Amino acid sequence: MQKLLISVNSIMAAKLQMIGNAAILEHPDKVAFLSSRRISPADVLKCYEWAEKVRDTERCVISGFQSPLEKDVLKFLLRGKVPVILVLARSLWKTVPEELREPVGQGRLLIVSPVAAARAYSATASARNRWILANCTSLVLGSLDPNGNLARLVASFPRNHITCLQDIPSGQENL
């Protein structure tokens, strides 16, 4: 049986696809939010606390918002005024989901797709996360599995720009 290998370059879109306020891409303080799939309930609460704190700041949050935790964080963020960049691991939707239309219309949400794929899968999620890291100024990790794909991905990111919420006592999350 032959194993199919897909190069990251082959799934990257020739041109970034966007819906919403493209000026958000130029924001000077873009914090990425990523998390390993495995996360303790206590660390989930830290992520919610962080999202509540950051949602009314001038920072910009960039993430894939794909996992259930990340989707919850997006809901917290959209209740505030923080600009948000949602990065898809697939090509853009034909129709913007109902719950995202208002923030897009208000100019607070930019939806982008750096990949050319009809569906999200492991390789496109990896390409998406690489794009997020290349376009942020700092990184907040909800949790980090030292043996997971995310740990390998963030290994080259400057350590002094990473905050891992699982390592911080509850209530003391940095913005």
Where are these regions (language model features)?
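Glycine-biased, small-residue-rich flexible motifs in mid-sequence functional cores and linkers
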Residues: Q2-L175
